[in-house]
């Protein structure tokens, strides 16, 4: 059985948090609502997979500031902005920084759920890619010094004879 996918909601509007929580739970998501970015950061495990649905305009820390904080912390959490007062430069900045989507309130349920599913898919793809990279780095560490020298020439695309000549061995 596949565990429920976690969606973090951060919005300072209590009525919206309740409505979105009900909607997403009905769709089978596990929901963690927060009324501000500070509470979210206190409770959030940076290694936890999932998707963050985030308001732009909030007191103390804006959604854009939270996004930047998560990027600096190395989080892979997919971010979807949901705002009532965004503008084009703000949305471009958010998307360039890695947001999956930038939606405006009111939003169709199907549009939000589709964006969340895409965000969760991207989170899993990023996690899989990071695991693959870590595995490859560990395998590289197993190479001897000489094998590492040869490897560096191979990845540059040098032919075997040139590598042998450069490293002073016979081919």
For the regions a language model picked out, list residue spans one by one.
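Acidic catalytic/metal-coordinating carboxylates
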Residues: 35-36, 61-68, 86
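Short amphipathic alpha-helix used as the core "switch/output" element in two-component signaling
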Residues: 42, 64-76, 93
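Receiver (REC) domain active-site loop signature in two-component systems and cognate sites
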Residues: 58
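C-terminal output helix
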Residues: 87-89, 103, 107-116, 162
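Active-site beta3 strand of CheY-like receiver
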Residues: 8, 47-53
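Active-site residues of response regulator receiver
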Residues: 55, 83
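Two-component/phosphorelay signaling modules centered on CheY-like receiver
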Residues: 2-5, 13-32
């Amino acid at each position: 059985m596949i565990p429920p996918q976690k969606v973090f909601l951060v919005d300072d509007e209590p009525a919206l948090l309740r409505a979105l929580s009900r909607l997403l739970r009905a769709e089978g998501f596990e929901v963690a609502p927060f009324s501000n970015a500070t509470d979210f950061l206190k409770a959030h495990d940076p290694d936890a997979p999932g998707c963050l649905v985030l308001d732009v305009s909030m007191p103390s820390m804006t959604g854009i500031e939270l996004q930047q904080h998560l990027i600096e912390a190395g989080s892979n959490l997919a971010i979807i902005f949901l705002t009532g007062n965004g503008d084009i430069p703000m949305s471009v900045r958010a998307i360039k920084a890695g947001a999956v989507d930038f939606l405006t309130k009111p939003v169709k349920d199907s549009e939000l759920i589709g964006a969340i599913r895409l965000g969760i898919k991207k989170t899993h793809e990023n996690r899989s890619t990071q695991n693959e990279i870590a595995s490859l780095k560990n395998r590289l560490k197993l190479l001897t010094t000489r094998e590492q020298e040869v490897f560096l020439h191979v990845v540059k695309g040098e032919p075997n004879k040139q590598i042998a000549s450069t490293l002073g061995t016979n081919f």
